[in-house]
Amino acid sequence: MTVDYKNTLNLPETSFPMRGDLAKREPDMLKNWYEKNLYQKIRKASKGKKSFILHDGPPYANGNIHIGHAVNKILKDIIIKSKTALGFDSPYIPGWDCHGLPIELKVEGLVGKPNEKISAAEFRQKCREYASEQVEGQKKDFIRLGVLGDWDNPYLTMNFDTEANIIRTLGKVIENGHLYKGSKPVHWCLDCGSSLAEAEVEYEDKVSPSIYVRFPAESAVEIEAKFSAQGRGQGKLSAIIWTTTPWTMPSNRAIAVNADLEYNLVQLGDERVILAAELVESVAKAVGVEQVEILGSVKGADLELSRFHHPFYDFTVPVILGDHVTTDGGTGLVHTAPDHGLDDFIVGKQYDLPMAGLVSNDGKFISTTEFFAGKGVFEANPLVIEKLQEVGNLLKVEKIKHSYPHCWRHKTPIIFRATPQWFIGMETQGLRQQALGEIKQVRWIPDWGQARIEKMVENRPDWCISRQRTWGVPMTLFVHKETEELHPRTLELLEEVAKRVERAGIQAWWDLDEKELLGADAETYRKVPDTLDVWFDSGSTYSSVVANRLEFNGQDIDMYLEGSDQHRGWFMSSLMLSTATNSKAPYKQVLTHGFTVDGQGRKMSKSIGNIVTPQEVMDKFGGDILRLWVASTDYTGEMTVSDEILKRAADSYRRIRNTARFLLANLNGFDPKRDLVKPEEMISLDRWAVACALDAQNEIKDAYDNYQFHTVVQRLMRFCSVEMGSFYLDIIKDRQYTTKADSLARRSCQTALWHIAEALVRWMAPILSFTADEIWQHLPQTESARAEFVFTEEFYQGLFGLGEDEKLDDAYWQQLIKVRSEVNRVLEISRNNKEIGGGLEAEVTVYANDEYRALLAQLGNELRFVLITSKVDVKSLSEKPADLADSELEGIAVSVTRSNAEKCPRCWHYSDEIGVSPGHPTLCARCVENVVGNGEVRYFA
C-alpha cells in the first residue's frame, strides 16, 4: 500500500487571493478606509514629526476628470504617502478653483445671462451651486484613485473664508506698492468680452490676410534729401509696412524703424519705396518685381520724425525708433497702433502717441470710426483691404498661415486691445528682478523648469489682474469718481469688506451700499465693478489657504506639483503674488510632469478617438494598475498610455502580487512572537536575503526621496523577480516544504520571509495602495498590536545587513548566482533535448578552477539545494572531458546526466538512499529524518 506523505509537508497556504480582482475589491477597501477615518489616523500617527507640505494646485471645478488629472493626483498621493513612510507629517488638503468664465458659460447655458432673465445675485448663486456639483463629481473620481486626503474639508476658492483671504492678499499687493491702473493693450477675447491672462492664451495656426501697405511721404523732397537721392528715381515715394492684421490700420499712429538698421530708398517698378536694406530682395520677390535700383541709404535714426500720410485717413504719422523692429520678416518698417500691440504701446508712450480707442468691448468699431463704424474687427479685414485698393495704397495682398493667439476656452482668435485695467507692475518695487532672484532659491524638478520660468518672467508683461465678469472675487476697491485715485483708507476698507465676505461670501460686496463704509465720501467715490483674474484666486492660495489652515501649523510650503503648462500658469501667478506680498517664493520645490499621449505619441483627442479615461481604466484594470502605470512612467517627458501599455503594467503587477502571495503563503503557521529566529542563528542564505532587502530598501527610500518613482518600480521588480523570484524563493521551497515544521531550518527561512514581507508591503504602499492594504491585513501579528493600516507606518526598521565577519558575504552569493545561472543554462539545453525533465532528475558535475572550487566547497552537500538538483559533484577544471562544451562563465564547465537513482515521492529528489528505513521504504534518508527523526540540519541554504 502506498503511503501519502502529503500531510507531513509544510505546504503553502493563504487566504490572500491569487487574482487581484482590483476593479471589484477596491471600492470595498475605500469604504473601509473612510468608515474608519484612515486619513485622520495618519494625521494622529504623524503628529509632532517634521512637516512636509505639498500644496494642491486646484483643478477647475468643471467637467469630469481626465487622465491628466489622474496622473497629477496619483503623483501627489505617492509623494504624500512616501513622505509619511519616510517619517514626515505630510497633510494633504485637496482644492478646487471655483470662479471664472467656464462656469459662467455653463450657467448661462442653463439660466441665461445675468441681468437678462436672472439677476446678477441669483446668477452668482447658480454658479456657486454648479461649482459645488462639479466638485462632488470630481471628488468621487479622485477618491476612487486611492488618493488619501481631507476630502471632507477641501479648500474651495469660493469658500467664504478663502474669498475673504483673497481680498486680503490684494490688500498686501496694494500695501507694497505693486498695483496700478492703466490703459494698455491686453489680450482681449471677443467671446468672453473680457481681458485674458497670459496663461489663458494658446497659440494655434490661423490663415490671415498678409498685406504690404504704402504710407505716402508728406514731403518727397525732404525724404530724397535724407537719402541724398535728389533727382534720382521716379514715381511717388512711400514707406512700406507689412501686417497680418488689416483691421488695426484705422488705429495706426506711427511707423517704427530700428535706429541702427540700414534703410534703402529703392526704385521698385514705377515707384520709390523705403525698405530695410536686408529685406529689399525678399519684398521685391513678394510683390513680383524682378529688378530694383538702390537710390540711397541711411540709418534708421536719420528717418526719425519724418512724416508720412496715413494710407486712408486725412492725417500724417511720424517715423519713430523702436528696438523691437527687426529684419526677421516684413519690410523693416513696422505699422504702429498703440491700442493693439504691447511693443506699439511701449514705444508709443515714449513719443506721446495718442491712443485711438476705436474698438469697443464687443470687438466692434465705435460709431465715429470713419469707413468701418459698427463692423467687427475680423469682419473689417476685407473692408480695409478694399479701402486700401480704392485709394491706391495697397502694394500687395495674399494669404498667410501663421501662429496666432487664441482663447484657451473658446478656441477663437483674440485681439490686443487697450482698455483701462488694473495691473501688477513687473518693474514697480523691483518685482521682476526679485522674482528672478527667488527662482534661483527653488529646486526645480526636472531642472530645466528653472530656465523655462526664468525666461517667462524675464519677458512677461505687467499682470492685468482685472476682469469684467460676474462670477469672481470682486476687486473691492473704491476710486474717486473724477480722478480714479484709490480711496486714502483703501487698506482699512479692504479689511472691512473682507470681514463681510467672510460671513456672507462675495455677494456681500455687490450688496454693499457705499455709504455704509464711506459715509460722506460716498458722494465722491464709487465701487470698482471689476472682478479678479482667477489666476489671482489660485495664485494666492499660499496665503489664503495654507497660511490660514490649522493643519499646516504656519509651516512654509515644500512643494508645488503640476503639469508643465503651469510654469506660465499657477507656478507663475503664485510666484508673483508671494514675491509681491512676502518677498519670497511660495514654494521650496516645484515638480512638473508631462502630458499624456497615446501609444503613437499623439495628444488625446475626441476627433481622433484616442481618449483614455481614468474611469475606463479603473473599471477594466483597477486603480492600482493605473497607479503602477503612473509610477512606472518617467513623468519628466510625455507620458504614453494605451491599452497595450496598461496590460504590461498589469503583467508587472501580477509578478509583484505573486511574490507577496508566496511570502504570505509560506508564513502560514508562523507566529513572530514565538517563532522569530535571531539574526546570528539564521541560516546564511536567509541572512543574505534580509540583507538584500535592506539594500533594496535603501535604494527605494532614496528614490522616493528624490521623486524617482520609475526607479522605485524598477527596483521593486528587480527585487521580486530577480533577487527573490529567480533565486532565493526558488531555492527555499525545498527547505520550507520538507523540513520539520518547527525546525530551525524552516523557522529561519520564515523569519527572513517575514522581515521581507514587512518591508515589501511598505515599499509598495505609496504606489500599489490597495494591494498593500490587502497584504497588510494578511500579515502575521507582531508582539505589539499591528497598526490597523500600513499607511500610518514608516519604512520597516527590522531589516539588517551582513556582519563584517560573515563568511558567506554578498560577494560570495553574487558569485554563486553566476554559477547557478550557468548550471541552469546547461540544464535548459538538456531539457530541450529531452535528456531530463526537471532539474531534480539531473546529476550535475561542475568542473571548476581553484577559485570556484573553493567557493563551491564552502556549501558542502547543500550546494545541490542552491542549484536545485538531486546531486552535484565538483571537480577540477583540468578533469574536464575534451568533448564538453565551453561554459559561458570563465573558470567553470558544466555537464548534466540523467539520474539513475530512485525518486523520493515526498521531496521529489532522486536518491541512492531510498529504502534505508524499513518503516518508510519509499522515502529518502533525508525525508525519514524530517518525518520521524529530529529533522535535517541546514547551515548555509
UniProtKB/Swiss-Prot annotation:
Residues annotated to bind ATP: 606
Location of this chain's protein in the cell: Cytoplasm
Motif ('KMSKS' region): 603-607
Xref: Gene3D superfamilies: 1.10.730.20, HUPs, Valyl/Leucyl/Isoleucyl-tRNA synthetase, editing domain
Cofactor dependency: Zn(2+)
Catalytic activity: tRNA(Ile) + L-isoleucine + ATP = L-isoleucyl-tRNA(Ile) + AMP + diphosphate
Motif ('HIGH' region): 59-69
GO biological process annotation, one example: isoleucyl-tRNA aminoacylation
GO molecular function, one term: isoleucine-tRNA ligase activity
InterPro entries, alphabetized: aa-tRNA-synth_I_CS, aa-tRNA-synth_Ia, Anticodon_Ile_BEm, Ile-tRNA-ligase, Ile-tRNA-ligase_type1, Ile-tRNA_ligase, M/V/L/I-tRNA-synth_anticd-bd, Rossmann-like_a/b/a_fold
Known EC number: 6.1.1.5
Binding residues for Zn(2+): 904, 907, 924, 927
GO cellular component, as recorded: cytosol
Family the entry assigns: Belongs to the class-I aminoacyl-tRNA synthetase family. IleS type 1 subfamily.
The protein's assembly and partners: Monomer.
Protein's job: Catalyzes the attachment of isoleucine to tRNA(Ile). As IleRS can inadvertently accommodate and process structurally similar amino acids such as valine, to avoid such errors it has two additional distinct tRNA(Ile)-dependent editing activities. One activity is designated as 'pretransfer' editing and involves the hydrolysis of activated Val-AMP. The other activity is designated 'posttransfer' editing and involves deacylation of mischarged Val-tRNA(Ile).
This protein's domain notes: IleRS has two distinct active sites: one for aminoacylation and one for editing. The misactivated valine is translocated from the active site to the editing site, which sterically excludes the correctly activated isoleucine. The single editing site contains two valyl binding pockets, one specific for each substrate (Val-AMP or Val-tRNA(Ile)).
HAMAP family (alphabetical): Ile_tRNA_synth_type1
Protein name: Isoleucine--tRNA ligase
